[in-house]
Swiss-Prot record:
InterPro entries assigned to the protein according to its UniProt record, in alphabetical order: TDE1/TMS (IPR005016)
GO biological-process terms attached to the record: antiviral innate immune response; plasma membrane phospholipid scrambling; positive regulation of endoplasmic reticulum stress-induced intrinsic apoptotic signaling pathway
Residues bearing attached sugar chains per UniProt: N34
Organism listed in the record: Mus musculus
Any Pfam family: Serinc
Modified residues (Phosphoserine): S371
Protein name (database record): Serine incorporator 3
Protein's membrane topology: Multi-pass membrane protein
Family note: Belongs to the TDE1 family.
One GO MF term: phospholipid scramblase activity
PANTHER family on file: SERINE INCORPORATOR, SERINE INCORPORATOR 3
Length: 472
């Protein structure tokens, strides 16, 4: 009897698979809005794609993929550096799988980007497709994934690698904008609370976190100088670290200039400290992609040097061993790639909960003027009977709270960023005989760090330059 009731209880949720997003989650968070829950579900779909991509790099999955006719032989035949020929297929099956998984996810979100252009309110019939029909969407993604494994190699992987570089570059720009927006919003929130009451507490909190981020930045920069430079070598690394340190000091000074404070009172050192730390991360990430291993020590050698008291500074040249061949299970992510995914997940969650009222960077992903927060009071959220799937309030009848099309474009580019991150930005050579790090990835990431600083600097000086525009 209990099993029968369980089946009927499960069946009551089936309509949710073909209806709105809020129906799927609102039993655990009844006071929510449709715009927020929909973004969370799309973000969760992308997160699942990321997990599947990571799983595809494991040995067991690769063994099964090798059984697919033509997947390992023919097409994109390349060899990993310092890897024996009999292990080539084990490594590249994982790389091919990551390309195809994220191809399916990117195509799915790009199709929705085109479909959702010019959607203004939830009354648009296309809004129902955006906010519902989850069974068919998931089935479509799975179908595209399965079909992508039968796409011939060769030119497909070559073209998709270029597409991945372009898409990942655009997502890094979006990620940088979200980071700047988060820093501004955090500072504004705490400054407001400091003005409302108990100023000493919030001032101490602001000072503590600002000091912490700057201390971490100083330690980070010192470690980069110690392990990624040499007295008579690694000139590029010295220039990269020094330039970005100078730029970070410059934007920190600009953020507290009287003129900037006059036009933008909420600007301060908290934002600058976050941007400084992130810029140094991008600098480190760029240097880990350098093909010259003498200036790019492995993580294990650095840890050994830090933990072993027997290693002297005179032996610091041992920190740059030859490139370690990947295991039989294939190449997996480096530490900087893992940190890149962590930052990606954070930005993805932030973009899902992000409110339009606290956006400081031109409301990049939002178009409405109302706040989209889970804690808002809603009417009719509990109208459903107990035990039935609760539905969230449709807060977009008068206007969408974010750009549907841009949100899908962001997720499309995010899937390409995941693809490049998991494969460590490896680039095939002209004859497709090996795959290795390239200076292109180094300059790409360094350019991203400079773009981050430029974006933040623009948010500081924009009110001074565009005096006729309201930045409040």
């Amino acid at each position: 009897m209990g099993a029968v009731l369980g089946v009927f209880s499960l069946a009551s949720w089936v309509p949710c698979l073909c209806s709105g997003a809020s129906c799927l989650l609102c039993s655990c968070c009844p006071i929510s809005k449709n715009s927020t829950v929909t973004r969370l579900i799309y973000a969760f779909i992308l997160f699942l794609g990321t997990i599947v991509s990571c799983i595809m790099m494991t040995e067991g999955i690769q063994t099964q993929l090798k059984k697919i006719p033509g997947f390992c032989e023919g097409g994109f035949q390349i060899k990993m550096v310092d890897t024996k020929a009999e292990k080539d297929c084990d490594v590249l099956v994982g790389f091919k799988a990551v390309y195809r998984i994220n191809f399916a996810v990117a195509i799915f979100f790009f199709a929705f980007f085109l479909l959702m252009l010019k959607v203004k309110t939830s009354k648009d019939p296309r809004a129902a497709v955006h906010n519902g029909f989850w069974f068919f969407k998931i089935a479509a993604i799975i179908g595209i994934m399965i079909g992508s494994f039968y796409i011939p190699g060769g030119s497909f992987t070559e073209v998709w690698f270029v597409a991945g570089m372009l898409g990942a570059s655009f997502f890094i720009i979006i990620q940088l904008v979200l980071l700047v927006d988060m820093a501004h919003s955090w500072n504004e929130l705490w400054v407001n609370r400091m003005e409302e009451g108990n100023p000493r507490l919030w001032y101490a909190a602001l000072l503590s976190f600002t000091s912490l981020f700057y201390i971490l930045s100083i330690v980070f920069a010192a470690l980069l100088y110690v392990f990624y430079t040499k007295p008579d070598d690694c000139t590029e690394n010295k220039v990269f670290i020094s330039l970005n340190l100078i730029f970070c000091v410059a934007v920190s000074i600009v953020s507290i200039l009287p003129k900037v404070q006059e036009h933008q009172p909420r600007s301060g050192l908290l934002q600058s400290s976050i941007i400084t730390l992130y810029t140094l991360y991008l600098t480190w990430s760029a240097m880990t992609n350098e093909p010259e291993r003498s200036c790019n020590p492995s993580l294990m050698s650095i840890i050994t040097h830090l933990t072993s008291p027997t290693v002297s500074p005179a032996n610091s040249t041992t920190l740059a061993p030859a490139y370690a061949p990947p295991s039989q299970s294939g190449h997996f992510m480096n530490l900087d790639d893992i940190w890149g995914l962590i930052i990606f997940v954070f930005c993805l969650i932030y973009s899902s909960f992000r409110t339009s009222s606290n956006s400081q960077v031109n409301k990049l992903t939002l178009s409405g003027s109302d706040s989209v927060i889970l804690g808002d009071t809603t009417n009719g959220a509990n109208d459903e009977e107990d035990g039935q799937p609760r539905r969230a309030v449709d807060n977009e009848k008068e206007g969408v709270q974010y750009s549907y099309s841009f949100f899908h474009l962001m997720l499309c580019c995010a899937s390409l960023y995941i693809m490049m991150t998991i494969t460590s930005w490896y680039s095939p050579d002209a004859k497709f005989q090996k795959v290795s790090s390239k200076w292109l990835a180094v300059w790409f990431k360094m350019g991203s760090s400079w773009l981050c600083l430029l974006l933040y600097l623009w948010t500081l000086v924009a009110p001074l330059v565009l005096t006729g525009r309201d930045f409040s």
